[in-house]
Amino acid sequence: MKVRSSLKSLKSRHRDCKLVRRKGVVYIINKTDPRFKAKQG
């Protein structure tokens, strides 16, 4: 999982990427292709 300062560009890398917020941390999750996982914060 990559830690990034900006996730907006990562969300558009794959059409199944979803932006999720858990406990103040923003995550990009992708069920079909897990190598696109990222987090911020």
UniProtKB/Swiss-Prot annotation:
Pfam families, per database record: Ribosomal_L36
PANTHER family referenced in this protein's UniProt entry, alphabetically: 50S RIBOSOMAL PROTEIN L36 2, LARGE RIBOSOMAL SUBUNIT PROTEIN BL36B
Keyword annotations of the record: Ribonucleoprotein, Ribosomal protein
A GO BP annotation: translation
GO cellular component: ribonucleoprotein complex; ribosome
Gene that encodes the chain: rpmJ
Entry's Gene Ontology molecular function annotations: structural constituent of ribosome
Family from the record: Belongs to the bacterial ribosomal protein bL36 family.
InterPro entries named in the record: Ribosomal_bL36, Ribosomal_bL36_sp, Ribosomal_L36_bact
NCBIfam families: PRK00831.1, rpmJ_bact
Protein name: Large ribosomal subunit protein bL36
